């Protein structure tokens, strides 16, 4: 397995170009199964999960090409099963189910794998598809969905806010007969992006970005061209990189209005932040950040995917900060690793109490999930001495060329190839 060797401390400064959002590109790629004509998707990041998705779509009979953009032609889909060998590495595969059953009347997806954070059941996806009239069976490790004729529009009230299930129901409902209303829908920018992509293909969706999404079913979706929105979590990660190192950064191809909660906390930490239509700049003027209190919650509140990075910020900040995780249990696996680097923190229930220290020291640490690994790499950039981050395949699932981008900011980082 590859690892990163990071030599610190470094002040990170310079420019970085933000990639397309993985969490929008994935549902959009799966939603392209609904289209009867070719689709061009621009600004798709080069990531392991994207490669897996393109392989999966190819296995279903979709024609997939990548040359700058990703081109998808799902006019000749002839296989309706997503097998375990591809699904096991990636939970997002469940998003194939809604489009398959909506367009072809059948689909089956192996129960998924992915990051090891807490309970992420597929129950809400199944609940939504059953409400739309699909017959669902769990057999031999597969979720199997079928329907006679078309799915039927329904009024669906979600028990809890779920990004994944909102995507499944919304994409399946585009081809259902009649109107579907999703109450307590997720409001994330990536949901809005997926809805806007479907609208570009001819779907009738309103209310995306609110907790009530309305979908009027249409008979077919055509082709189109769509550009994936910038990755707000990658943007936030690089802003934190500059903030913890007293540095200065300009993020290009960013979308500031998707990051309000994160930018507010960075300002509280003492960062000087400016924004334009597609850029964000942050300047710490060489200062240490101040500790901040953070509570994760569904969008538009503070995103759980930025929690690990802000835990690190608090560990090197002036003062004591509290970070409360309300979305996933078991999402503090980075904390013991950061403590090994000299961080001072204790975990009480779903809150980590961080006591800022002036410096961290390099150590051998292990990545446990995607965002935790990013925080360990950033910690290595500012720690005294050498840090080795193991199991970085997690990072490759969600950050495009992270070492190249960090190197451009002055980090001393290299990838050590595994056996």
Swiss-Prot record:
UniProt-listed Pfam families: EPSP_synthase
- Give the pathway listed in the UniProt entry for this protein: Cell wall biogenesis; peptidoglycan biosynthesis
The protein's GO terms of the molecular function aspect are: UDP-N-acetylglucosamine 1-carboxyvinyltransferase activity
**CDD domains (alphabetical):** UdpNAET
2-(S-cysteinyl)pyruvic acid O-phosphothioketal: modified positions: 115
Q: Give the GO terms filed under biological process for this record.
A: cell division; cell wall organization; peptidoglycan biosynthetic process; regulation of cell shape; UDP-N-acetylgalactosamine biosynthetic process
Determine if Isomerase is one of this entry's keywords: no
Recorded protein name is UDP-N-acetylglucosamine 1-carboxyvinyltransferase
- What are the top taxonomic ranks of the organism? Bacteria, Pseudomonadati, Pseudomonadota, Gammaproteobacteria, Enterobacterales
């Amino acid at each position: 397995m590859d690892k990163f060797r990071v030599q610190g401390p470094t002040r990170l400064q310079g420019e970085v170009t933000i990639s397309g959002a993985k969490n929008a590109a994935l549902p959009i790629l799966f939603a392209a199964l609904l289209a009867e004509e070719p689709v061009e998707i621009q600004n798709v990041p080069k990531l392991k999960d994207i490669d897996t998705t393109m392989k999966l779509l190819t296995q279903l009979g979709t024609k997939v090409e990548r040359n700058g953009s990703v081109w998808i032609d799902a006019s000749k889909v002839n296989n309706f099963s997503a097998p375990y060998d591809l699904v096991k590495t990636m939970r997002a595969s469940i998003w194939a189910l809604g489009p398959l059953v909506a367009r072809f009347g059948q689909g089956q997806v192996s129960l998924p794998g992915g990051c090891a954070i807490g309970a992420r059941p597929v129950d809400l996806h199944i609940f939504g598809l059953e409400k739309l009239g699909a017959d669902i069976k769990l057999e031999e490790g597969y979720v199997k969905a079928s329907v006679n004729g078309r799915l039927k529009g329904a009024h669906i009230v979600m028990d809890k806010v779920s990004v994944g299930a909102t995507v499944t129901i919304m994409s399946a409902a585009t081809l259902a007969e009649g109107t579907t209303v999703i109450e307590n829908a997720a409001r994330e920018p990536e949901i809005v992006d997926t809805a806007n992509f479907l609208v570009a293909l001819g779907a009738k969706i309103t209310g995306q970005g609110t907790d009530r999404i309305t979908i009027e079913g249409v008979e077919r979706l055509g082709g189109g061209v769509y550009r994936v929105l910038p990755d707000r979590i990658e943007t936030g990660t690089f802003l934190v990189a500059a903030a913890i190192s007293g540095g200065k950064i300009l993020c290009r191809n960013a979308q500031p209005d998707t990051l309000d909660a994160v930018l507010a906390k960075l300002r509280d930490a003492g960062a000087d932040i400016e924004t334009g239509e597609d850029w964000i700049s942050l300047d710490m003027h060489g200062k240490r950040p101040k500790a901040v209190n953070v509570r994760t919650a569904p969008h538009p509140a503070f995103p759980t995917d930025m929690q690990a990075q802000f835990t690190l910020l608090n560990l090197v900040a002036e003062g004591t900060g509290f970070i409360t995780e309300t979305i996933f249990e078991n999402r503090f696996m980075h904390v013991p690793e950061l403590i090994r680097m000299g961080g001072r923190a204790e975990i009480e229930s779903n809150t980590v109490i961080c006591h800022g220290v002036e410096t961290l020291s390099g150590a051998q640490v292990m990545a446990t999930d995607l965002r935790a690994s990013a925080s360990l790499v950033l910690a290595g950039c500012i720690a005294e001495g050498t840090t080795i981050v193991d199991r970085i395949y997690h990072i490759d699932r969600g950050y495009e060329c992270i070492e190249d981008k960090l190197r451009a900011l002055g980090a001393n980082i290299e990838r050590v190839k595994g056996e």
